[in-house]
């Protein structure tokens, strides 16, 4: 896998190319979630309490894959539906796969503020985020920062929530991470001076899109 830096729009084109070559979006989501979980496992040789903060889009879908893998491995998993149930088809399918597992589903982040977690997965907002955080996002990012300060290890899926992928602009109240797992290609925010330090260590995972499938930019 080549090291490359692409914008949010270019990443969409790359995913479209993967789908056109027979790698379905659902499989890319599975590969992304499992790759992120593998990096989390490296930090924790033994399972503990895990909070997976999921938005309603495909970033949240990656989070549901992580939650499923962790629950099967013996983690005590809580999923926070920060903005309600998922809205995209692939995220919905992965949310439904949690129903047969011992995963706690929570819709009110305020009840988690006094709880303790070994790790938090930030799967709230993905590469489509821009502008300012809405009140719900501000509250959820505040919860992530609060738990981080309390000692939880924070893994961000693609990027810490509240950062603009293409410019690195950081919204007031954005989340911070110890480790950011991005997929296929790095994004501008991962190297921008104003945002890179909020990502912690950055790892770019292969999700099955071959180099020769990539469009020329």
Model-predicted regions and their roles:
Residues 13, 23-24, 48, 113, ...:
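Hydrophobic alpha-helical context, especially transmembrane and signal-peptide helices
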Residues 1-46, 210-217:
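Positively charged, low-complexity intrinsically disordered leader regions
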Residues 15-19, 40, 44, 102, ...:
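Structural signal for hydrophobic packing residues in well-ordered secondary-structure cores
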Residues 2-9, 117-217:
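YjeF_N-associated NAD(P)HX repair module
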Residues 6-9, 23-35, 61, 89, ...:
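Conserved active-site and cofactor/substrate-binding residues in soluble primary-metabolism enzymes
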């Amino acid at each position: 896998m080549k090291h490359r830096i692409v914008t949010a729009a270019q990443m969409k084109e790359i995913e479209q190319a993967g789908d056109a070559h027979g790698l379905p979006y659902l499989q890319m989501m599975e590969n992304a979630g499992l790759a992120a979980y593998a990096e989390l496992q490296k930090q924790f040789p033994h399972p503990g309490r895990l909070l997976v903060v999921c938005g309603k889009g495909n970033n949240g879908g990656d989070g549901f894959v992580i939650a499923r893998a962790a629950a099967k491995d013996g983690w005590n998993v809580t999923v926070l539906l920060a903005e309600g149930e998922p809205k995209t088809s692939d995220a919905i399918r992965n949310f439904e796969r949690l129903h047969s597992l011992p995963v706690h589903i929570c819709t009110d982040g305020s009840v988690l503020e006094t709880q303790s977690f070994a790790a938090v997965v930030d799967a709230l907002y993905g590469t489509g985020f821009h502008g300012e955080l809405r009140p719900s996002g501000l509250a959820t990012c505040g919860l992530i920062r609060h738990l981080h300060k309390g000692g939880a290890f924070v893994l961000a899926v693609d990027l810490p929530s509240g950062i603009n992928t293409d410019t690195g602009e950081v919204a007031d109240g954005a989340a911070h991470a110890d480790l950011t797992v991005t997929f296929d290609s790095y994004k501008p925010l991962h190297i921008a001076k104003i945002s890179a330090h909020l990502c912690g260590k950055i790892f770019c995972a292969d999700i099955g899109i071959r180099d020769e499938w990539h469009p020329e930019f």
